Amino acid sequence: MKRWTNLGFVDTIYEDEDYVDHHSSSLSSSSSSLSLSPKQPINLSSSPSMELESRVHKWSLANNSKPDVFVNVGGTRFHLHKDPLSKSGYLKRHLTGVNELTLSPPLNITAETFSLVAGFCYGAHIELTPSNVVSLRIAVEVLLITEADDGGRVRDSLRNLTESYLRRVVFVNVDYIQIVLRSCLLLLPESETTAFLIGRCVEALMEIGDGDCVNEFLEEAVKLPAGDFNVVADAVQQRFPRHDLLYRIVDAYVKEHDGEMTEEEKVQICNSIDCDKLSPPLLLHAVQNPKMPLRFIVRAMLQEQLNTRHSIMVAAVAASCAAPTGVRHREIATEARDSSVTLGSLLQRDTAARQNCRLRAAMNSTSSRIESLEKELDTMKRFLSKESEKQKSDRNIVESRSRSVMDSARSASFHCVHQPSNVNKTQRGDRGSVSNLSTTYRRRRASPPQAQPQKSIGKRLIMGIKNAFSTSSKQVPKKNAYAVEEIYDGLEDFVWIKDDNDDNISEELHSHYIKNK
């Protein structure tokens, strides 16, 4: 017994035997001892450091070796041996060829935690508490602590010790779970990315805790930055088959930081929620939640439509399969006699009835939305048809106007000007005359030598046109001249519009006019 006393194990064995009773009495004494009081870090920082110094001194005497490396952690300098620290894969790799190492961020390890880990590497016993188990577990994962041996015997690794403590002590006590969960939130993101503790703590809290415990966790979670909250949301998503709790957490966080978050940040947070894993009441709440991003609301609406369609199909199949046959009725009656009605079946039946009512309400709201959309679609169709008819009528009006303009242009190609005798005419050579383009002839009506039947102007015009376009190259000027004379016989004044090919006709008409005059 003297040898154990000299080695310094008497107090450690006594504390280990009375470990559970000690913590139980501390919990029953006051509720304040469950929180992270400032006294606990003082005890943790002083006691392990003194024990570590003792362990280093004893190891130096036993192996006749002085400390050969320095490790700087959080402003504290540790003078240690390289051989015991080789139990850490991280320290062994980074201390190769050097005698000094600094553990700085992103390694989230404090000096108190490192003193406990280093003492474990020297073979010391570590007293696990709800306040230090999270930091030790993170240090184990970051520093890659494997196992330690004491006197040739292989001891359990520090990872197994912390895991056993979490399962046997922490996850069966609500107060311990809350302490560990607060420590995890303070040590994000390492507490989840390396140790996966947040999801496990929330799962244990939901199993043995009540609504007040969950509300306290929500109050702590909404205070986190967006990046750390994404880690918490992903952890809860992976641990729970249903996402009702995750939706409550995300909804509380979005409401708390509504004016501080962008739409993209809201979408990123809401992407952790699977709408297919939401209960019907929360799915309906998500559809009607104005704080959620529009993309998430659309996803919830589509999922609600799918659930409604699935419920309708299941009801239709059940109705079609329930054929009123005598054999089926006898089987149902036999099953009813054989099976006794239990409280669980009644509760299940009541739950199914409530779900049917909620589904019916959701289906009615969906039908009303579909009807409103159909009305809007019909209104848009009528508006588009009116616009197309209006455009068609405008096009027809434009085409008719263009045709009338073209017809008037064609009718003006051959123009006859009837001038009264009392109007002054522009003389040949005057300004504005068209003597170079037209020739004006004036004649008086001559009394016919013999009575001939008078022809109408229209008939004479037609005959003149026929004679003017008759096929005889030698007689063309003469015929054209007489044709024009015949056309305009009875008119005192007329104007002949001359083309380039009408020089011969103009001369013939002029000579004929002089002879008759």
UniProtKB/Swiss-Prot annotation:
Residues 28-37 have a biased composition (Low complexity). The lineage of its organism: Eukaryota, Viridiplantae, Streptophyta, Embryophyta, Tracheophyta. Disulfide bonds: none annotated. Residues 28-49, 409-456 are annotated as: Disordered. Residues 38-49 have a biased composition (Polar residues). Pathway: Protein modification; protein ubiquitination. Keywords: Ubl conjugation pathway. The BTB/POZ domain mediates the interaction with some component of ubiquitin ligase complexes. May act as a substrate-specific adapter of an E3 ubiquitin-protein ligase complex (CUL3-RBX1-BTB) which mediates the ubiquitination and subsequent proteasomal degradation of target proteins. This is BTB/POZ domain-containing protein At3g49900. Residues 67-130 form the BTB domain. The keyword Transmembrane helix does not apply. Transmembrane segments: none annotated. The keyword Ribonucleoprotein does not apply. It comes from Arabidopsis thaliana. Residues 224-307 form the NPH3 domain. It comes from the Eukaryota. One of its GO terms (biological process) is protein ubiquitination. InterPro entries: BTB/POZ_dom, NPH3/RPT2-like, NPH3_dom, SKP1/BTB/POZ_sf.
